[in-house]
Amino acid sequence: DLECPSGWSSYDRYCYKPFKQEMTWADAERFCSEQAKGRHLLSVETALEASFVDNVLYANKEYLTRYIWIGLRVQNKGQPCSSIYSENLVDPFDCFMVSRDTRLREWFKVDCEQQHSFICKFTRPRR
């Protein structure tokens, strides 16, 4: 596996980076995806990954907003949550964030138009 770019943290086969800029959920997702192919707002797949990301956020908490966007959102009423990006958000309260104070132990469903810091994730390229 190749290393993560400068400024990005590495765990397993992924790279992570929190950004202090305050954006809406859609703008933050767009920002992540424009950095390079395959980059998106954070999705968490295991408890160990959550613990790693928790430490990344804690190490950067002094310059992040209190709440940080993650990639989780509700797609449609009655459907399961999804971490796949779509601009067709039905309800303005369909986006999720975490608090830097409670770390990843609590997720909050809020208005997608709020502006917060965010964390991007992507799979490291293979050689």
From Swiss-Prot:
Entry's Gene Ontology molecular function annotations: toxin activity
GO BP field: venom-mediated suppression of platelet aggregation
- What residue stretches are annotated with the C-type lectin domain? 11-121
Superkingdom of the source?
Eukaryota
Please describe what this protein does: Binds to the subunit GPIbalpha (GP1BA) of the platelet GPIb/V/IX receptor system. It inhibits ristocetin- and vWF-induced platelet aggregation in platelet-rich plasma by inhibiting the binding of vWF to GPIbalpha.
Kindly indicate where the leader peptide sits in this chain: none
What family is it from? Belongs to the snaclec family.
**Keyword vocabulary terms for this entry:** Disulfide bond, Hemostasis impairing toxin, Platelet aggregation inhibiting toxin, Secreted, Toxin
> What tissues is it present in?
Expressed by the venom gland.
Q: What SUPFAM superfamilies has UniProt attached to this entry?
A: C-type lectin-like (SSF56436)
Q: From the Swiss-Prot or TrEMBL record, state where the protein is found.
A: Secreted
Q: One Pfam match, by short name?
A: Lectin_C
InterPro entries linked to this entry: C-type_lectin-like (IPR001304), C-type_lectin-like/link_sf (IPR016186), C-type_lectin/snaclec_domain (IPR050111), CTDL_fold (IPR016187)
| Entries under PANTHER family matching the protein | MANNOSE, PHOSPHOLIPASE, LECTIN RECEPTOR RELATED (PTHR22803)
Give the record's subunit note. Heterodimer of subunits alpha and beta; disulfide-linked.
Q: List the disulfide bonds.
A: C4-C15, C32-C120, C95-C112
Gene3D superfamilies in the cross-refs = Mannose-Binding Protein A, subunit A (3.10.100.10)
Task: Give the CC-aspect GO terms.
Answer: extracellular region
Query: What is the protein name given in its UniProt record?
Result: Snaclec CHH-B subunit alpha
